[in-house]
Amino acid sequence: MLNYKKIEITVKSKKQFVKAEYSAVEQNKERQMFNADWSKKSDQPINRDLSNAWDRLIPMLMYGTTLVDHTINLDESMDYDKYFREFEYNNDERFDGVNVTKAVFGGNNNVESVKLYGYKLIEEFGKPFKVKFETPVIALDRHAENKFPLVVNLEEMCNDVQVLTKEWMAGATLSKAEVAALKEKEAGEPVEA
């Protein structure tokens, strides 16, 4: 049985690649059980649906930090639907020049947190500069009311990453309907394809 440890999405040449780390209970020739830690890295970009979902979540993650601009903070009275689902954040110049190069999802058999790494392009004396940043570890706490829309979307995407990664590690290529069926099986409840 595979136990999820960490999923890392790295951006190279505007494409996202996945690296997954798992632990598993293995059996040696003498039939003794032991814990084995191992990882697998893809050499193919992640699929389009997952890539699009990840791109849409970046502003939500950045909005949950104070690194891009000190005025970016979670606000309980915020209209999340309007700001994120209607892509109003595209007009927010505080996100201009923000590039996330890596997202690391951590946990203990479940996705519990995420941390972002990247840079913001700024111009000084007529020349562009990359100012590197990394966010704090962002806990995926479904019960924090002011973070609920953010967390629900993150968890949904992380579940997709886990399902796709497990099957990819087994050498399978899945359709969207097959991914939905696997998610339904793991969650024990129907999931729309």
Identify the role of each PLM range:
Residues M1-V111:
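OB-fold ssDNA-binding interfaces and closely related basic DNA-contact patches used
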Residues R94-E186:
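Conserved binding-pocket/active-site segment within a compact domain
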Residues K185-A193:
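Polybasic, proline/glycine-rich intrinsically disordered low-complexity segments
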Residues N52, S175, E192-A193:
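Secondary-structure junction/capping motif
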